[in-house]
Amino acid sequence: MIPVVIEQTSRGERSYDIYSRLLKDRIIMLTGPIEDNMANSIIAQLLFLDAQDNTKDIYLYVNTPGGSVSAGLAIVDTMNFIKSDVQTIVMGMAASMGTIIASSGTKGKRFMLPNAEYMIHQPMGGTGGGTQQTDMAIAAEHLLKTRNNLEQILADNSGQPIEKVHVDAERDNWMSAQETLEYGFIDEIMTNNQLK
């Protein structure tokens, strides 16, 4: 169930679902697994807010276990394409593809709440049963290219050498807010609403 917010206007009362009301304040909620429909919704909101006023920041709150690489990269590409600065605020967790998105916010405007967690790892893939050996080789090559691309993005976003990112992302690597800050994925740990 999505909560509804009632607002008093000069014309009377107006009700919004909570996400529409937050969008009015340039806030986008990226929550849950990253998949195509969710990514398309986030992209549409980014494009709408940028077209509305590209001189104002957009606030992207992130709480996700990760998900589809292609859907996540579509969000990242849109964040980089629009003119508006995108502030990212990690709450709960940014894991897997979520770390790519959260760390791709505008440098100097990447935040994390004190009890949130970050997790990097190598991308996962599979070919399923009954797959021909040639198809398995193609899938393995694609997975390796994807891993190299994601590690380069993480290296660029954190300022860490790609070799370090490669080693650190070999297995699930969970980080506290302080560790995430020290690694370079975020710029500040928020202890109150500093975005106003």
Swiss-Prot record:
The active site is at 96 (nucleophile), 121. It comes from the Bacteria. It catalyses: Hydrolysis of proteins to small peptides in the presence of ATP and magnesium. alpha-casein is the usual test substrate. In the absence of ATP, only oligopeptides shorter than five residues are hydrolyzed (such as succinyl-Leu-Tyr-|-NHMec, and Leu-Tyr-Leu-|-Tyr-Trp, in which cleavage of the -Tyr-|-Leu- and -Tyr-|-Trp bonds also occurs). One of its GO terms (biological process) is protein quality control for misfolded or incompletely synthesized proteins. One of its GO terms (cellular component) is cytoplasm. The keyword rRNA-binding does not apply. Its EC number is 3.4.21.92. Pfam families: CLP_protease (PF00574). Cleaves peptides in various proteins in a process that requires ATP hydrolysis. Has a chymotrypsin-like activity. Plays a major role in the degradation of misfolded proteins. Belongs to the peptidase S14 family. PANTHER family: ATP-DEPENDENT CLP PROTEASE PROTEOLYTIC SUBUNIT. This is ATP-dependent Clp protease proteolytic subunit. The gene is clpP.
